[in-house]
Amino acid sequence: MTLSFAHFTYLFTILLGLTNIALASDPETILVTITKTNDANGVVTTTVSPALVSTSTIVQAGTTTLYTTWCPLTVSTSSAAEISPSISYATTLSRFSTLTLSTEVCSHEACPSSSTLPTTTLSVTSKFTSYICPTCHTTAISSLSEVGTTTVVSSSAIEPSSASIISPVTSTLSSTTSSNPTTTSLSSTSTSPSSTSTSPSSTSTSSSSTSTSSSSTSTSSSSTSTSPSSTSTSSSLTSTSSSSTSTSQSSTSTSSSSTSTSPSSTSTSSSSTSTSPSSKSTSASSTSTSSYSTSTSPSLTSSSPTLASTSPSSTSISSTFTDSTSSLGSSIASSSTSVSLYSPSTPVYSVPSTSSNVATPSMTSSTVETTVSSQSSSEYITKSSISTTIPSFSMSTYFTTVSGVTTMYTTWCPYSSESETSTLTSMHETVTTDATVCTHESCMPSQTTSLITSSIKMSTKNVATSVSTSTVESSYACSTCAETSHSYSSVQTASSSSVTQQTTSTKSWVSSMTTSDEDFNKHATGKYHVTSSGTSTISTSVSEATSTSSIDSESQEQSSHLLSTSVLSSSSLSATLSSDSTILLFSSVSSLSVEQSPVTTLQISSTSEILQPTSSTAIATISASTSSLSATSISTPSTSVESTIESSSLTPTVSSIFLSSSSAPSSLQTSVTTTEVSTTSISIQYQTSSMVTISQYMGSGSQTRLPLGKLVFAIMAVACNVIFS
């Protein structure tokens, strides 16, 4: 009896299952390390190691289903980021992948109707939800990806090799933080299609690979981003590049795709990010070969509000990403193996075996800055900063057999509680410069027209723990009399029943006069000459800090008490006289104020002037649970050194040091930022066994080594059954 095509396919399927056992007993170690550095979130490192392929093959009614997983798997993620208030996430992530082998009739006109072709189908589904305990005000993050199917049909040829890998991932990030009296909603949609198809041999191979991705839409003040589908065919490279089109104050960004023919097998996944009125997108590439694939496809869509201008006829709008969108997501499809059966009188077939994708925690951050300028010299700056860290997870895998069909389920559970945050920060700044008469007593008599610069800065920081901080800063400066005033007000809502408010006002002005000191000693010629001249400067500074209140929303009672009030008045008289050899005056006045309150403040100011260029240093150190630190030092006009140290946070974790030194010939600026970090390490490991069902001659079980004797016997038994049936 001759060996028919159906018999050959049956034998090939059995050999494929036996090879899967060999794969499970012969691990292949793959080490993947991804390091991403971001200014806002520090360094995030993800390591996946080792990668051992474990497969299960089910043969039923002529259809072979191959279930693939990683066995064992260790995912280690370490991140260095700013310490933030702790909150607990409840996370559920389920993932399921199958690879089905079946046969179908070839539709080519040159092939007879009895020609059947082995068909490979890969299906991946995933669902991810995350929520916070309802007592902490609900925040939900969910991700649901569509089912992607790749079908590869290989016709008869001489040693063709065909491999297809698809990684469709569509993630939706939505964050809703509810805290009385405000509710903040944040949503971002990411679509990252990745499709790679390789066919090294160009002899009569018909392959098709289609990747479908849902459109990505983010609506925030009329901003829409749509990502079309990406299609990759055999021996081709498909890359998707995004472009942005800005129209007035609502923009639409559309991704355009370009296709080029190339024997290489590289697919670039592009994400489109739309912001109003301008956008910048960051895309990550995905490289796939027949043995290894890594796909990183981050996307975060954020848009800034639409702002109205006071002077539409002369309005310039610009939007820039001060901190480009970054996200770390890893999808790994590894150890694609080809099994070939060769016989001189029969065609050659090659079917790939591809492991399932592995998802890792992702970290996203984005900062958008929008500037609107009009004729009145007013400038509006809006900054939106979004930083979200998805918590860690653990993984479990189990099998279910129903009616002879075994299905493998990979579940990412249970959730883990980590110190994760979801922070939304926005700032609105208005700067106005007008030519008007200053109201200070030195300017009013002369009715001198001066340039008055006014600034109002409003910012709101909302953390997922319902701690909301709103600040308002206003300043006023006159170019003639150097009168300046500064007001700072901060309102912090720790919960729905507690409100803390602090207001600080500072006003200063400078009066200067120039005197001439003449020496009337006669020279031999009888003439007089000036020996020295000097300038004296008087400065007065007044600072006031007041107002802290607590409101109990349950009893509707308000208790307000003044924690601290300090008035700082410092005046300094300094004069510099220039002569041949004398230093006449050195004066320095320092003031120190320490306030003990929920926010501890230390202020040090120092003013000094001497003849020779020197540097004056002010050093301040404070250690408290909540701290705010400010130090300022000023020295001579010819060589100025300015030092500012600021630290303000819920916990003493972030310190910023800014040093500026300038002189006539050169200038030097040094910026040092020190961030206390917390390091988290997540280790996930699980072990599964592969199951192989080979007809009725060999049972199912788990194998750690290749039983050659039993396999040879099974092949002989099945071959005899096929040949003589």
Swiss-Prot record:
A lipid is attached at residue 699 (GPI-anchor amidated glycine). GO terms for cellular component: cell periphery; extracellular region; fungal-type cell wall; side of membrane. Residues 182-307 are annotated as: 18 X approximate tandem repeats, Ser/Thr-rich. Sequence repeats lie at residues 53-149, 182-188, 189-195, 196-202, 203-209, 210-216, 217-223, 224-230, 231-237, 238-244, 245-251, 252-258, 259-265, 266-272, 273-279, 280-286, 287-293, 294-300, 301-307, 395-493. It is found in: Secreted, Cell wall; Membrane. Keywords: Cell adhesion, Cell wall, Disulfide bond, Glycoprotein, GPI-anchor, Lipoprotein, Membrane, Pheromone response, Repeat, Secreted, Signal. One of its GO terms (molecular function) is cell adhesion molecule binding. GO terms for biological process: agglutination involved in conjugation with cellular fusion. Extensively O-glycosylated by PMT1 and PMT2. Residues 1-24 form the signal peptide. Residues 53-493 are annotated as: 2 X approximate repeats. Residues 168-318, 335-363 are annotated as: Disordered. It is a lipid-anchor; GPI-anchor. Residues 700-725 form a propeptide. The number of the intragenic tandem repeats varies between different S.cerevisiae strains. Heterodimer; disulfide-linked. Cell wall anchoring subunit of the a-agglutinin heterodimer. S.cerevisiae a and alpha cells express the complementary cell surface glycoproteins a-agglutinin and alpha-agglutinin, respectively, which interact with one another to promote cellular aggregation during mating. This is A-agglutinin anchorage subunit. It comes from Saccharomyces cerevisiae (strain ATCC 204508 / S288c) (Baker's yeast).
